[in-house]
């Protein structure tokens, strides 16, 4: 299931971030790719230990921790520090599946990649191509969001980034280990959480709200990996 999260950053904030990233020194993106991915990865990346990457990564995590939809959809237990990439001049990333486990640089911390995320910083009309294409149950789905918007998708997904033939596509990408490993279980919990919130708005104080909230937490208790 693909989940779009609007306006993690406003358009103005995304533009400021993009301007700072445009002035940074980029390196070959294959430095963080696995053996198979490196054969189809053609882009540039901000070094993981670059001060700007660390500063913006912290800012992204702060925003996401306050975003109700993100927290409900991802149920994050661990989040890999955000990375930043850039595509232009025909650069692309062919079909691949992300590594199942990532080690946080400079630590022994391991993150199981239950979910992947891309946060766009370039406006769609400033570049051609660059669509994130994610294969799911219903076939390939193409994603190209406004600057400041984010997409979540299962880490198990086969996916690619189409060649950028005009302009530049700058984005952040990262992975999460969820409290709930299985995508279908997370989706069910998200649907229930959204329904409870709507019921709270439409019929505040209804006794069913307490019952449904209890069911939600009992399912989470059954499925959570803590």
Curated annotation (Swiss-Prot):
Keywords: Dioxygenase, Iron, Metal-binding, Oxidoreductase, Vitamin C. SMART domains: P4Hc. Its EC number is 1.14.11.-. Coiled coil: none annotated. Transmembrane segments: none annotated. Binds 1 Fe(2+) ion per subunit. GO terms for biological process: DNA damage response; intracellular iron ion homeostasis. One of its GO terms (molecular function) is L-ascorbic acid binding. InterPro entries: Oxoglu/Fe-dep_dioxygenase_dom, PKHD_C, PKHD_hydroxylase, Pro_4_hyd_alph, Pro_4_hyd_alph_FE2OG_OXY. 2-oxoglutarate binds at residue 169. It is an enzyme of class 1 (oxidoreductase). The keyword Oxidoreductase applies. Fe cation binds at residues 96, 98, 159. It comes from the Bacteria. Its cofactor is Fe(2+); L-ascorbate. Residues 78-178 form the Fe2OG dioxygenase domain. NCBIfam families: PRK05467.1-2 (NF003973), PRK05467.1-3 (NF003974), PRK05467.1-4 (NF003975). This is PKHD-type hydroxylase Bpet2704. It comes from Bordetella petrii (strain ATCC BAA-461 / DSM 12804 / CCUG 43448).
């Amino acid at each position: 299931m693909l989940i779009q999260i609007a306006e993690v950053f406003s358009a103005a904030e995304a533009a400021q971030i993009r301007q700072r990233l445009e002035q940074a020194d980029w390196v070959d993106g294959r430095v963080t790719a696995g053996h198979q991915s490196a054969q189809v990865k053609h882009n540039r990346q901000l070094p993981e230990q670059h001060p700007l990457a660390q500063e913006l990564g912290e800012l992204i995590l702060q925003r996401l921790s306050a975003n109700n939809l993100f927290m409900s959809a991802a149920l994050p237990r661990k989040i890999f520090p955000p990375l930043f990439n850039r595509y232009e001049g025909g650069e692309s990333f062919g079909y691949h599946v992300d590594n199942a486990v990532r080690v946080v640089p400079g630590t022994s911390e391991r993150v199981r990649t239950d979910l992947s995320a891309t946060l766009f910083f370039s406006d769609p009309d400033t570049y051609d191509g660059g669509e994130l294409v994610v294969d799911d149950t219903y076939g390939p789905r193409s994603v190209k969001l406004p600057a400041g918007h984010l997409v979540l998708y299962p880490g198990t997904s086969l996916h690619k980034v189409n060649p950028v033939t005009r302009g530049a596509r700058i984005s952040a990408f990262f992975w999460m280990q969820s409290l709930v490993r299985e995508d279908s279980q997370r989706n069910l919990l998200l649907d229930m959480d959204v329904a409870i919130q709507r019921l709270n708005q439409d019929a505040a104080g209804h006794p069913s709200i307490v019952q449904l909230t209890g069911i939600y937490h009992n399912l989470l208790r059954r499925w959570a990996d803590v």
